[in-house]
Amino acid sequence: MSTAALLIPAMILDAAFGEPKWLWSRLPHPAVLMGKLVQALDDRLNEGDGRQVKGVIAVAVLVFVGLLLGWILSWFGSLVSVLIAAILIAQRSLIDHVRAVATGLQNDLDAGRSAVAMIVSRDTATMTGPQIARSAIESGAENFSDGVIAPAFWFLVAGLPGLLIYKLINTADSMIGYRTEAYEDFGWAAARLDDVLNILPARLSALLIALVTGRAGDWGEISADARKHRSPNAGWPEAAMARALGVALAGPRSYDGEMRPFAWVNASGSKSASAHSITRCCEVLWKSWGLALVLVVALGLLF
């Protein structure tokens, strides 16, 4: 079977069941195992001199593990491939986490802050309602690219090996891809490879969002806003979502008690995002997922 034919049931299974707690409370989630592998490489290699070279070695190990494991698992048949893809694509989980912020924010600020703290790394203790909403929307848009479209894309392109390599590198980037004293050198290779692997998926995610919301005509503005972002990729789905909802995203935010300047995305949009804005974001993400599924079905029929 083609990878497109396998991806169709995988996307549907993920959307229907997400990450059932009864299962993953008893078994280690593959993402957790990936994190343990990255942590082991960090503990073993991130010390002494030549840390950038050691970081390249760590990334090479991750690529090799993904390639080998994906090749081995592919021999177990289509059902295994579908199940693994369903587990590693995270649309339902993404929506659940983002929607939880809207629910919390509708109750009170503290509940909203607690919910958004689950999905962002910035300081949340003193966030206002609009800041909570913007953070949730930004996270939803970015993770639609990282957690849904990118894994689906690499599964389409290279099957299980492609999917596993992507998830391993993306996990490494989330753990060691920081410009801090500890990871500036060691995490360089993981961060750069993650950037490369997300170039096409990020722009595809933005296009899907723009198409389902009738904002394709704003592509020039979306592109300009995307380039303001510090990440070469995260700005694309965020800029598209900002236009889709008519809100301004990004802007100054606090990390580790320090307020840092970030350019506004869709600066002319409303800066009063709310729980309702988050709910609309979730609706856009489902519509974008639906269009992605239609495209995968079309590929399955063609190939």
Swiss-Prot record:
UniProt entry tagged with the keyword Amino-acid biosynthesis = no
Gene Ontology annotations of biological process type: cobalamin biosynthetic process
- Keyword Iron, does the record have it? no
A Gene Ontology cellular component where this protein is annotated is: plasma membrane
* Localization in the cell: Cell membrane
Pfam families xrefs: CobD_Cbib
Q: Which pathway?
A: Cofactor biosynthesis; adenosylcobalamin biosynthesis
Q: Which HAMAP family does the entry link to?
A: CobD_CbiB
Q: What does this protein do?
A: Converts cobyric acid to cobinamide by the addition of aminopropanol on the F carboxylic group.
Task: Please report which protein family the annotation says this sequence is part of.
Answer: Belongs to the CobD/CbiB family.
The entry's protein name is Cobalamin biosynthesis protein CobD
Q: What is the lineage of its organism?
A: Bacteria, Pseudomonadati, Pseudomonadota, Alphaproteobacteria, Rhodobacterales
Could you tell me the gene encoding this protein? cobD
